[in-house]
């Protein structure tokens, strides 16, 4: 067996997994969490995990669906986000060779309310962080640990956590 104090010390030294319910910008007036959730099941689990934490404010969910992948999941993910979140922003997530707007239209088929649509992911992150009220949580889903956005066959540098951290700094400075 392992001594309990040794096991506890080892557990305390563990680092969180990048892009999996990753908190961004500790100490700010809103919570921002980045997660790789890119399937219906993963999105629902991420939303439910975030909702289980102590948070009195609204839950914002920002997500998109990848292009050239299973189009059948898009409306289902829209349904899940719109059912469980207080505010939803639908955006791009590696559209690859597809039109970002066409992917978003597929997602919107699953929404029975009116989510915010912003195809530019950087602008969507900026919008969510700017519009969130004190105590709100913003869940940025779909890319997690990825450091690129694939558009038209080109991988462009893009990191959800870095973009969110930049916007949080701007929010705190204002």
Model-derived regions, located:
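ATP-dependent carboxylate-amine ligase
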Residues: 1-174
